[in-house]
Amino acid sequence: MLSELFNSLASFFSNIFSLFEGKKETRILMIGLDGAGKSTLLYKLKLGDVVSTIPTIGFNVETIEYKNLSMTVWDVGGQHKIRPLWKHYYHGSNAVIFVVDSTDRERMDEVKEEIDNLLIQDELKGTQILVFANKQDMNNAMNTAEIVNSLDLNSIKDRKWYVQPCSAIRSDGIYEGFDWVANSLNNK
């Protein structure tokens, strides 16, 4: 009986202290090839609406409060000439979100090459990777199994990874993907 009372009090105080703890600061790097929908996805999550976007030259940065996290999301342009600059955003990243255009089958080899390059970066060692398989609202979108196979994701053994099908335009799958990121960061 005494131990039950002690456990109840411990749980009570733990819950009280968590209220004052605040949100855990995290840094998320959002990258992907040009036209994948990175900015659309970011602003759909931030503003709850689809905004008109133009190709990102450089980066967009937004802070998003999600669950117990304060996520600073760096959305970096994906044009071929900009990709060498991605390395300048690696430092301090807690997670990488790689947005893929699920309808762009011709560029999956290029996506795989970029993901493989991320996996060998010292500054990203152990950093989890969420692959948003975007544009699932389109008829010719690749499903999750096709994305996993095309990118050979099952060969990744040194970190957590997850593929979340989504449609940035319709908000489908966005919150589920960020749930995975939040849960993974909290269990790290």
Curated annotation (Swiss-Prot):
<dbReference type="GO" id="GO:0003924">
    <property type="term" value="F:GTPase activity"/>
</dbReference>
<protein>
    <recommendedName>
        <fullName>ADP-ribosylation factor J</fullName>
    </recommendedName>
</protein>
<keyword id="KW-0813">Transport</keyword>
<dbReference type="Pfam" id="PF00025">
    <property type="entry name" value="Arf"/>
</dbReference>
<dbReference type="InterPro" id="IPR027417">
    <property type="entry name" value="P-loop_NTPase"/>
</dbReference>
<comment type="similarity">
    <text>Belongs to the small GTPase superfamily. Arf family.</text>
</comment>
<keyword id="KW-0342">GTP-binding</keyword>
<dbReference type="GO" id="GO:0005886">
    <property type="term" value="C:plasma membrane"/>
</dbReference>
<dbReference type="InterPro" id="IPR024156">
    <property type="entry name" value="Small_GTPase_ARF"/>
</dbReference>
<feature type="binding site">
    <location>
        <begin position="134"/>
        <end position="137"/>
    </location>
    <ligand>
        <name>GTP</name>
    </ligand>
</feature>
<feature type="binding site">
    <location>
        <begin position="75"/>
        <end position="79"/>
    </location>
    <ligand>
        <name>GTP</name>
    </ligand>
</feature>
<dbReference type="GO" id="GO:0005737">
    <property type="term" value="C:cytoplasm"/>
</dbReference>
<dbReference type="GO" id="GO:0016192">
    <property type="term" value="P:vesicle-mediated transport"/>
</dbReference>
<feature type="binding site">
    <location>
        <begin position="34"/>
        <end position="40"/>
    </location>
    <ligand>
        <name>GTP</name>
    </ligand>
</feature>
<dbReference type="GO" id="GO:0006886">
    <property type="term" value="P:intracellular protein transport"/>
</dbReference>
<keyword id="KW-0653">Protein transport</keyword>
<keyword id="KW-0333">Golgi apparatus</keyword>
<dbReference type="InterPro" id="IPR005225">
    <property type="entry name" value="Small_GTP-bd"/>
</dbReference>
<dbReference type="GO" id="GO:0005794">
    <property type="term" value="C:Golgi apparatus"/>
</dbReference>
<comment type="function">
    <text>GTP-binding protein that may be involved in protein trafficking. May modulate vesicle budding and uncoating within the Golgi apparatus.</text>
</comment>
<keyword id="KW-0547">Nucleotide-binding</keyword>
<keyword id="KW-0931">ER-Golgi transport</keyword>
<dbReference type="InterPro" id="IPR006689">
    <property type="entry name" value="Small_GTPase_ARF/SAR"/>
</dbReference>
<dbReference type="GO" id="GO:0005525">
    <property type="term" value="F:GTP binding"/>
</dbReference>
